[in-house]
Amino acid sequence: FKKFIDSDDHIKRADYLAWERKYWDLKRMLKYLPTDQRALYNARQILMSNSYGVDNAIAKVPQYLKKDPGLEFDRLRWRNRRGRLESSLEILYKNANKTERQMIRPDLWWEQRKSVARTLIYKKRYKTAYKISSEHSLSSGPSFAEAETTGADNKTP
């Protein structure tokens, strides 16, 4: 298959596997990626699988790839699972004005955004929860309806 599949195809497959959270398959195909992309997807794989060396893996990602929406998402999810609310908010604020297309998978971003918003509501930080809920970048579908409803529920009088 080497003559039919080029590095762009491998990058697309790696991106698909990463967004689908198939980190074991992603890990097995890292060797087919160009060096810079290998560093990016290795960091994503480590974040997804809760492996050791997260900081080291992220440090190896080239600067121009550190703003990759997938890496940002995996970092958000990793921080959110560990209860790091303020650093989760930092990532959400940094990605607040991106379009649905720039987010790649805004539906998955919404799940993390919703989780952070609920934590904020629990902590009685209603205005911040509303801000986080309303900046969802969705335009249609069930997640859009939920995001719009959640944002409306968080409005303070």
What does each model-identified segment do?
Residues 1-157:
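Alpha-helical solenoid repeat scaffolds
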